[in-house]
Amino acid sequence: ALVRGEDSYVWDAEGNRYLDLFPGWGCGLLGHCPGPVVEAVREQLGLLIHVPNTWHTELQGRWAEALSTRSFGGQAFFCNSGTEANEAAIKLVRLHSTPKRRYKIITFEGSFHGRTLGSTTATAQPKYHEGLGPLMAGFVYAPFGDLDAVARLIGEDTAAIMIEPIQGEGGVRIPPDGFLAGLRKLADEND
């Protein structure tokens, strides 16, 4: 069993050192116990450990402003995980689009959006769907990088296009040049 880690190395209970070649998930890609992260966590532990999202904190406000000014602008919603962020995105899309009778969300083959039912349904990989019974309705899948296929899937009932800009499930898949801009254009043309 592993008992500690530092940078790219981990140690087991017997003191054996191993080079950790696993890329990790989003929260683990900085290595094991990187100094600046450890110090920031120590500092935060002396201030606030956890508050529910019904409370506002100064740091949250600063992060929300930084995210909003560097992205699409508007509001920010903080979550505990990528799955929770994707579930919130699905709900917000449905909430906004239901009055327009839109519900369909286009996702991409090879994607991974999480392990809850909605996020698993958004994940366009049959191996994650096996044994789950009926999945959440309203998801359709397009080949990653194929703008023409996406355009064919868009209809009056389409509410959103959901994409990992760079896919990481089973390797790193970078979209072809112009693909993300093309998706933005398709979305804008179809409200």
Annotated model-derived regions:
Residues Y9, L29-L30, V140-Y141:
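Short, well-ordered beta-strand elements within core beta-sheets of diverse protein domains
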Residues R17-I106:
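Glycine-rich loop-to-alpha-helix module at the N-terminal edge of alpha/beta enzyme cores
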Residues V3, D7, P34, H56-Q60, ...:
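Generic structural signal for well-ordered, non-membrane alpha-helical segments
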Residues G5, G110-Q167, G171-K185, E189:
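PLP-dependent aminotransferase-class I/II
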Residues A1-E6, G26, E43, L186-N190:
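Conserved PLP-binding active-site segment in aminotransferase class I/II-type PLP enzymes
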Residues A1-D20:
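Active-site and channel-lining beta-strand-loop segments
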Residues D7-Y9, Q75, K104, G138:
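Conserved beta-strand and immediately adjacent loop positions that scaffold enzyme active sites
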Residues W11-D12, L30-H32, T121-A122:
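Short beta-strand-to-turn element immediately C-terminal to the catalytic PLP-Schiff-base lysine
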